């Protein structure tokens, strides 16, 4: 069966039903439907070296979402270092990763399975963070998704979120289910439980059915992305810095926009009920 037809059938099952107006409840409902399909967490089922290319895994449990804006690999690093499109010309990276000398090749695969090769010509760092922005040699193909970020008022849609202080530092406590990739491009799920000084902390999910889809991070996962689900869309939150921790992209939104010379795309939460 054609890959796009299959994805359409799966998406209709997962997203075609009425979902809860509560954002977090809707995420859990969608996770349940996704887990009914498969336990296979691999985005890709195979790859070839000559010509270089990847085959999308039609059995991946998270295949209904659009992962085409996440890099399949980087020449010389494989799946290490991540790379997610935040504009047609820019990718989110991790500053501490020893990326190859510029220019280096980065690869993306669209939903039908075509591999695209670009060159990262320079990398800019966001001062005081582990965020780096790579510039591509040309605009990414329109068939590759550019990811949005959360709106500034996202916290008003998260029930149970609290804001406190510890040693004079603001600490946000919450339970926000997320999806994330590792260096093998496997999709796992966890919960953001704290935001401290512009960093998000991820732990195993409290949602019992999702616990089998959690995997702890390890060295080499750096730069790979973390997303939250907003309806049928993946919204980018950041990229792995160290085990269980990543820079919260919204904290550094202004600095990122200054580097890329444009505004980041913003997701729409207005269809959900505000709880705060």
Where are these regions (language model features)?
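A short alpha-helix/helix-coil micro-patch that ends at or immediately precedes a cysteine
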Residues: 90-100, 140, 174-176, 180
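Residues that flank catalytic or metal-binding motifs in active/ligand-binding sites
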Residues: 87, 102, 128-132, 172-175, ...
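A structural motif
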Residues: 51, 85, 91, 132-136, ...
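A conserved glycine-rich beta-strand in the N-terminal activation segment of trypsin-fold
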Residues: 59-94, 127, 223
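Single-pass alpha-helical membrane anchors
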Residues: 1-15
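Flexible, gly/ser-rich surface segments that form the specificity/activation loops bordering the active-site cleft
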Residues: 162-209, 217-218
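Conserved catalytic-core segment of clan PA serine endopeptidases
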Residues: 31, 99-163, 183-192
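C-terminal subregion of chymotrypsin/trypsin-like serine protease catalytic domains
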Residues: 13-52, 85-97, 192-211, 215-276
């Amino acid at each position: 069966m054609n890959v796009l037809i299959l994805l359409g059938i799966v998406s209709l099952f997962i997203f075609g039903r009425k979902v809860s107006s509560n954002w977090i409840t809707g995420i859990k409902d969608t996770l349940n439907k996704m887990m009914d399909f498969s336990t296979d967490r691999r985005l890709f089922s195979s790859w070839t070296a000559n010509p270089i290319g990847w085959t999308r895994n039609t059995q991946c449990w998270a295949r209904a979402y659009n992962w085409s804006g996440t890099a399949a690999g980087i020449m010389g690093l494989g799946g290490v270092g991540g790379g997610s499109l935040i504009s047609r010309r820019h990718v989110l990276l991790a500053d501490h990763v020893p990326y190859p000398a510029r220019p280096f090749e980065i690869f993306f695969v669209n939903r039908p399975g075509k591999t695209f090769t670009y060159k990262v010509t320079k990398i800019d760092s966001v001062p005081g963070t582990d965020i780096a922005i790579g510039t591509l040699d040309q605009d990414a193909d329109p068939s590759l998704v550019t990811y949005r970020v959360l709106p500034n008022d996202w916290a008003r849609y998260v029930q149970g979120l609290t804001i406190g202080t510890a040693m004079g530092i603001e600490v946000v406590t919450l339970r926000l289910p997320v999806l994330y990739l590792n260096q093998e491009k496997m999709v796992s799920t966890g919960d953001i439980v704290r935001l401290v000084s512009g960093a998000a902390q991820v732990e195993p999910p409290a949602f019992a059915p999702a616990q089998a889809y959690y995997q702890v991070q390890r060295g080499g996962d750096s730069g790979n992305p973390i997303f939250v689900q907003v309806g049928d869309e993946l919204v980018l939150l950041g990229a792995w810095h160290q085990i269980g921790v990543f820079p919260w992209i919204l904290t550094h939104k202004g600095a990122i926009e200054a580097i890329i010379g444009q505004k980041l795309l913003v997701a729409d939460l207005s269809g959900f009920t505000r709880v705060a």
